[in-house]
Every structure is written in C-alpha cells, then in structure tokens.
C-alpha cells in the first residue's frame, strides 16, 4: 500500500512501530544524503564521473591501488564533516528504546555508529570507509597512517605485518561479501516482525534479498524511498517522501 500523504504514512508507520517487538531497519544511501554524503549511483554521483575500480584490478595493479586511495582522500572532507541526519537519529532512538536489536546497512559512512548504535549492532554489508584493512592478513590500519604513507610516497600502502596491499575496509566490485555480516543479516531478517527498508533502490544483490526474506518469514515490510522500487508491490506500506521528514517525528520518541 502506498501512503497517500506524508502525514498518513507517518501515522501508519507509528502504529506499526508501536505494535512491533523486533524492528530491523535496512538502510541505503538515501538516508545519508541529508548528511551531505552523495548517493554514488545517482546522476551526477561519483560513479557517473569515475568508474568503480574492480577488486581484481586493485589487487593486480599498483596504479589502480594508487587511484583508489586518491579518490578516497578526495572525499575526505565529505566524510569528515558528515553528521547523523534525522533518519539516523530516529533509528538510534528506536534502538535505545529496545525496539531495534540491530541494523543492516549498505552504507560505508559509519554514521549509524556515530548516531548511537553499538558497533556490534551495525551489520555492514558493504564495509566501512573510516578505516582500512590488509587484503592479505586482514590487519586493521587506521586512516591517519594510510594518509601519511600515501602523501609521503605518492603510492598506496602495504601492510606492516605481511606487506600485502591495504585498502579501505569496504567491499569493492568483484570482492566477496563479508560472510559474518551476511549470516547476521539473514538471521535478523528471519526473526523480526517489522522490516523497514530506508533509502535503498533495492537493486543491489544479494543485499536486496533481505526485505523479501523478512516478508517471506512473516514480517511486515515498510519501504521508505523517494523513487519506486521493484519490491513496492510486496510491501505492507510504501512511503515515497523525504526520509528526514518521515522519520523525524520518531527522534527521541
């Protein structure tokens, strides 16, 4: 059902939240645009100007690794200045109230943690851009160290433990999805009674399968997104309005 108006959608969503005992939010890029982080897939977004660097190219070529880190540091101020928007804060309020056991996100910006979610309760399907990992041994490297290395040498860094390449702790095209995050997201979708997909076009698989899984397992499904999605027809409620305006009334409540 598509909400006929914003107020109607908010009222229906509030009623569904009140009657739910285990709510699992699933967030995409749309929730962070209010924080100043662009949706990379949108027209004019980063990927319309620069093709993503596939994982196998990153592994094989020094110039690809250098370019990947150049792009990351070109976005430095965007990520550094970003603060949780109304959508993030509303979900954090529901989490603190005990309604939300954990959150599933496609985002890499760390804003759910900043908004108040414990790190272990944020299931990051596509990783996190605020630190780096060795692609060999998995050792974590902080961005301050990477930045110093990159601007001193002009090249992407190598791990201090095993000398393999270091990349942002994000999932690149062609890179395997994190198995622990996929397992946890599956469990959350299977056992919630309300699944809310927020700011996602629901076209990137396998992540887009979680709303369908939740619905198949008996949960109510809400989709909050300005544009239509292919899963609108199976949703119990579709709200095609601004995320901040839709979730804003739930901040602190």
Curated annotation (Swiss-Prot):
Binding residue positions for nicotinamide: 40, 108-109
The keyword Cell membrane belongs to this UniProt entry's keyword annotation: no
Subcellular location field: Cytoplasm
Residues bound to NAD(+): 29, 33, 40-41, 106, 108-109, 126, 200-201, 225, 242-243
Domain Deacetylase sirtuin-type: 3-253
Keywords associated with the record: Cytoplasm, Metal-binding, NAD, Transferase, Zinc
Record: active site: 126 (proton acceptor)
One term of GO molecular function: zinc ion binding
Protein name: NAD-dependent protein deacetylase
EC number: 2.3.1.286
Catalytic activity reported: N(6)-acetyl-L-lysyl-[protein] + NAD(+) + H2O = 2''-O-acetyl-ADP-D-ribose + nicotinamide + L-lysyl-[protein]
Cofactors that this protein relies on: Zn(2+)
Gene Ontology annotations for the cellular component aspect, listed alphabetically: cytoplasm
Manner of cofactor binding, per the entry note: Binds 1 zinc ion per subunit.
Alphabetized SUPFAM superfamilies for the sequence: DHS-like NAD/FAD-binding domain (SSF52467)
Membership in a protein family: Belongs to the sirtuin family. Class U subfamily.
Annotated binding of Zn(2+), by residue: 134, 137, 159, 162
HAMAP family: Sirtuin_ClassU (MF_01968)
Summary of the function given for this chain in its UniProt record: NAD-dependent protein deacetylase which modulates the activities of several enzymes which are inactive in their acetylated form.
């Amino acid at each position: 059902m598509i909400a006929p108006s914003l107020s109607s959608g908010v009222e229906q969503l509030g009623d569904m939240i009140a009657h739910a005992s285990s709510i699992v939010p699933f967030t995409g890029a749309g929730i962070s645009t209010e924080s100043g982080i662009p949706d990379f897939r949108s027209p004019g977004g980063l990927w319309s100007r620069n093709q993503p660097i596939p994982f196998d190219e990153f592994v094989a070529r020094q110039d690809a690794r250098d370019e990947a880190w150049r792009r990351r540091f070109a976005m430095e101020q965007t990520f550094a200045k970003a603060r949780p928007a109304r959508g993030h804060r509303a979900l954090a309020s529901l989490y603190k109230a005990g309604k939300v056991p954990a959150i599933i996100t496609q985002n890499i910006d760390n804003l759910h943690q900043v908004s108040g979610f414990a790190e272990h309760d944020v299931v990051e399907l596509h990783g996190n851009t605020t630190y780096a990992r060795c692609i060999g041994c998995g050792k974590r490297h902080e961005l301050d160290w990477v930045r110093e290395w990159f601007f001193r040498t002009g090249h992407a860094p190598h791990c201090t433990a095993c000398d393999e390449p270091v990349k942002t702790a994000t999932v690149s095209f062609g890179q395997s999805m994190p198995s622990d995050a996929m397992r946890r997201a599956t469990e959350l979708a299977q056992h919630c009674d309300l699944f809310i997909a927020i700011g996602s076009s629901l076209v990137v698989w396998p992540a887009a399968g979680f709303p369908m899984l939740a619905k198949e397992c008996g949960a109510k499904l809400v989709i909050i997104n300005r544009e239509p999605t292919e899963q609108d027809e199976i949703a119990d409620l579709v709200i095609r309005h601004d995320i901040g305006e839709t979730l804003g009334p739930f901040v602190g409540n």
